[in-house]
Curated annotation (Swiss-Prot):
This is Universal stress protein D. It comes from the Bacteria. Signal peptide: none annotated. Belongs to the universal stress protein A family. The keyword Cytoplasm applies. GO terms for biological process: response to starvation; response to stress; response to superoxide; response to UV. The keyword RNA-binding does not apply. Induction: During growth inhibition caused by the exhaustion of any of a variety of nutrients (carbon, nitrogen, phosphate, sulfate, required amino acid) or by the presence of a variety of toxic agents. Positively regulated by guanosine 3',5'-bisphosphate (ppGpp) and by a RecA/FtsK-dependent regulatory pathway. It comes from Escherichia coli (strain K12). It is found in: Cytoplasm. GO terms for cellular component: cytosol. Required for resistance to DNA-damaging agents. NCBIfam families: PRK09982.1 (NF007436). Pfam families: Usp.
């Protein structure tokens, strides 16, 4: 199958390189657009009852550091049809919205082989709603 626009769900971790390399190989083979998608789910909302005066500054610093890693990753990709989307929202809804807006026909995402992921994989909520193909790349936990 020929893909025209490949979306890659990235988290800002080292594993992103594996996902990007897989997607880049497919993009080159299909002469497809490549969109790296990062969903910022808002760490500050995890503990709504707790607030420290420096919380916003710390969260902004963490976000800037994470965003810089993502920009650097995108800049190092040797493919002219590459872009980065960083959106604030919840998984999987925001990811599905971006996939639809970008008209992606393939989503590349990763999966850790852990006990909790076997019980509740993050992609479970996407499968029945996704109109694009889904490539799940296993991460080997060390």
């Amino acid at each position: 199958m020929a893909y025209k626009h490949i979306g890659v769900a990235i988290s800002g971790n080292e594993e992103d390189a594996l996902l990007v390399n897989k997607a880049l190989e497919l993009a080159r083979h299909n002469d497809a657009h490549l969109t790296l998608i990062h969903i910022d789910d808002g760490l500050s909302e995890l503990y709504p009852g707790i607030y420290f005066p420096a919380t916003e500054d710390i969260l902004q610093l963490l976000k800037n550091k994470s965003d810089n890693k993502l920009y650097k990753l995108t800049k190092n990709i040797q493919w002219p049809k590459t872009k980065l989307r960083i959106e604030r929202g919840e998984m999987p809804e925001t990811l599905l919205e971006i996939m639809q807006k970008e008209q992606c026909d393939l989503l590349v995402c990763g999966h850790h082989h852990s006990f909790i992921n076997r019980l509740m994989p993050a992609y479970r909520g996407m499968i029945n709603k996704m109109s694009a193909d889904l490539l799940i790349v296993p991460f080997i936990d060390k």
